[in-house]
């Protein structure tokens, strides 16, 4: 489960009439009796069509952490007006992450998500996970390449987030599976004190030259033979959980899609609930962005 960093982003992560309590140490939704927390949102739902088409995942396990008591529902939204409740039960907990007694077959195109309704006051909804016990996994190691030119604050923001949420987080699956290579075209960044992050001073050869340098540094690193390289803009706000989901998705890919490339969507930095693009078309020098100006707060 992922959490908003500010109130403006709440509807990208959850819909609730409770109170969102967010901190670095722990987060939860504080609920009174009858309050709800609904996760049919951009960041906390699962796009079943993509996972079913491209990965070997067929069934899902669901783990939930609550403190208190309430009703949990596993729901599937085929379209805005077509909703199915796949599993429902009264559930209580002491805050520990516990597996629900259900096994969900991944439906076709649509959105899989959880709903929770508190049955008593002072109930906390803390966390949930979708997982699979599939044995066939690909061994994936990611190199993230960032090209930058005199954007010290932007690059430091990204590196700090990765350090805190991945490298210093024992629970992160990427902790030993990610290396970062920064092409410093402005030659203004100090060397990294974190061994997993490599800063390379580079001639100002633009984005193409900077990304190429980062790719070259990754390929010649024999101590960390990366299977995939992720190209990241220096001024983009990167949420580390996106890198974790990318790693998970790649590790479960079907063999026939093993050479495919993943393209990420881009949100508006000033208005983070507006999608700037999700893919683009190139035609003789003209670029047409796709799925522009979508309000991602809507269901």
Regions found by a protein language model. Give the residues of each.
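Glycan-recognition and processing domains
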Residues: 1-49
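N-proximal low-complexity "stem/linker" segments adjacent to membrane-targeting elements
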Residues: 18-21, 36-160, 173
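Phosphate/oxyanion-binding active-site loops and adjacent basic polyanion-contact surfaces
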Residues: 151-158, 203-211, 238-242
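Acidic donor-binding segment of Leloir-type glycosyltransferases
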Residues: 162-200
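Conserved donor nucleotide-binding strand/loop of the catalytic core
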Residues: 192-209, 217
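Conserved donor NDP-sugar-binding/catalytic core segment of glycosyltransferases
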Residues: 220, 237-288
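Short beta-strand-to-loop acidic/aromatic patch adjacent to the donor-nucleotide binding site
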Residues: 223-237
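A recurrent flexible, glycine/aromatic-enriched loop bordering the glycosyltransferase active site
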Residues: 292-299
